[in-house]
Amino acid sequence: MASPSLERPEKGAGKSEFRNQKPKPENQDESELLTVPDGWKEPAFSKEDNPRGLLEESSFATLFPKYREAYLKECWPLVQKALNEHHVNATLDLIEGSMTVCTTKKTFDPYIIIRARDLIKLLARSVSFEQAVRILQDDVACDIIKIGSLVRNKERFVKRRQRLIGPKGSTLKALELLTNCYIMVQGNTVSAIGPFSGLKEVRKVVLDTMKNIHPIYNIKSLMIKRELAKDSELRSQSWERFLPQFKHKNVNKRKEPKKKTVKKEYTPFPPPQPESQIDKELASGEYFLKANQKKRQKMEAIKAKQAEAISKRQEERNKAFIPPKEKPIVKPKEASTETKIDVASIKEKVKKAKNKKLGALTAEEIALKMEADEKKKKKKK
């Protein structure tokens, strides 16, 4: 006999379930489903949602560089205080150079351990505690972009990374204002903290910069998008017609060769035949010498070279024993206390002073002076 569970259902038993389901509207736009209404926030996860806590304890650990040791040691009490509010333990191991976070029996939020892991990762990547602690908020996320392996050449990598920062950090500041994210460029990574929409744009700009696309192009398009988002009508439309289209220009610079060969002037005559070894020996007279004479001559030339090299080496050794030239001793000049008195010049000055009369001139002296002046004028005429 068949069991009641294996019996077939009656006809029309399941039709009522399909009848109750509402048909999906065919003309409904996908953009309306994807858009989030203004002012909507995700409800916070409280202890009432999970009163019994977590079943198992979870932990994450990360290493940090040596230069961050002093800063982490200083701000670690603040890190522990921030994590204790969410019932998460944090330990700093200076010997191993690692940071560890783990849940406790009081932890009620299952996702807080992931946020705590991101916190210690950001602290290891030279992000300040004031910025890194924001990751514990619900509406804030982080992204650590690895850029070290995107460019092979070290010099080219440094140049493109500096292009991302900009002169005096102006490009990075503009990107932070447009995306509402905090961005930190350190070594081979770029750390960003902010909303999800901003992090998506930051990742795109960073990767494009490493692919030799200047960040100013992406910043320009972000500025246009920011203005378009303010318009409620254009929010649900495609923005491709408003965004600028940049053409890629591949300029191939022809590299000059290291060795430049200069062509000689054309001559109809062939080049002169080079002299052979026999011709050289005939010219010097060595060709007619005997074998033992040639050998003796060769040995004499070698000995002469050796003697010259020994003499040069000896001169260089003797240079260390030659004393340096002493500077001539300059005796300090004694200041002469006696001053020479010129008696003759003093006498002349006294005579001139005696001849001079003090006070106004007399009437006779004035008349004589006027006559002398008139005579001088007549002579000039």
UniProtKB/Swiss-Prot annotation:
Part of the small subunit (SSU) processome, composed of more than 70 proteins and the RNA chaperone small nucleolar RNA (snoRNA) U3. Residues 154-206 form the KH domain. SMART domains: KH. One of its GO terms (molecular function) is RNA binding. The gene is KRR1. There is a cross-link at residues 24, 340, 369 (Glycyl lysine isopeptide (Lys-Gly) (interchain with G-Cter in SUMO2)). One of its GO terms (cellular component) is intercellular bridge. The keyword Cytoplasm applies. The modification N-acetylalanine is found at residue 2. It is found in: Nucleus, Nucleolus; Nucleus; Cytoplasm. Part of the small subunit (SSU) processome, first precursor of the small eukaryotic ribosomal subunit. During the assembly of the SSU processome in the nucleolus, many ribosome biogenesis factors, an RNA chaperone and ribosomal proteins associate with the nascent pre-rRNA and work in concert to generate RNA folding, modifications, rearrangements and cleavage as well as targeted degradation of pre-ribosomal RNA by the RNA exosome. Keywords: Acetylation, Cytoplasm, Isopeptide bond, Nucleus, Phosphoprotein, Ribonucleoprotein, Ribosome biogenesis, RNA-binding, rRNA processing, Ubl conjugation. PANTHER family: HIV-1 REV BINDING PROTEIN 2, 3, KRR1 SMALL SUBUNIT PROCESSOME COMPONENT HOMOLOG. CDD domains: KH-I_KRR1_rpt1, KH-I_KRR1_rpt2. GO terms for biological process: ribosomal small subunit biogenesis; rRNA processing. This is KRR1 small subunit processome component homolog.
